[in-house]
Amino acid sequence: PEWVEKYGQKAAYFCTNDAHTEPLLKQLLEYGGYFIEADLPSPLMGYPGALGLDLTEEAGDFEKILNKVESAIVEKGGADHFGTWAYSYGYTLSAGLALHAKNVLDGKSELLDMDDVAAALQGYSPKAAWNGAGYTNATTGVKSDNVFLIYQDTYIMGDPGHFMGNADVEIPEKYFTIS
C-alpha cells in the first residue's frame, strides 16, 4: 500500500524474489497497480495462491490454467493490469529445448538457429510467439554463437486478454552494448 500511495495506481511493479510474488499480487489487486510478469513467468507463479485458486482439475493444461487465473483476475477488477507468459517458463523451456535437441539429433533442425529453437518452443506453447537473439557481451560487443536470450510474448489478462506483441519487436543492435 505504501508504494501505491507513493507511486500511484499507474505504476508497474516487479520482483525477483519468487516468495514475494504472491503477496505482491494480493496487494496490487487490493490497492491498484500493474504487474506485467514475474521473473519466471507463468500463470502458476504467485497467481493461484494470491487468488485462492485450486488448479487440480486443470493440472498440466496451461490454456485451462490461464483461463481460470484470468477469470479470477477479471472478477477482482484487475483486467488489463496483470500479465504473464501464457505457458509456464519452466515447462516450455524444459520440454521445448528437449524437443529442439531431438530435432537436431534427427537432422531436422540446426543447433544454433534461433528460428528452429523458437519452433520447438512453439510446440509446447501453441498460441504464444517467441523471439530472441544471441547474447552480446555489453562490454566487448562480442556476440555469442551458442547462448541465446529468448522470450515468449507476454499475455495481458483481461476481458478479453491479449498478447502484447513484444515477440514481434525488433530490438536495434545499438542496445546490445549499453553498459
Regions found by a protein language model. Name each.
Residues 1-179:
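A residue-level marker of the well-folded mature domains of exported/periplasmic proteins
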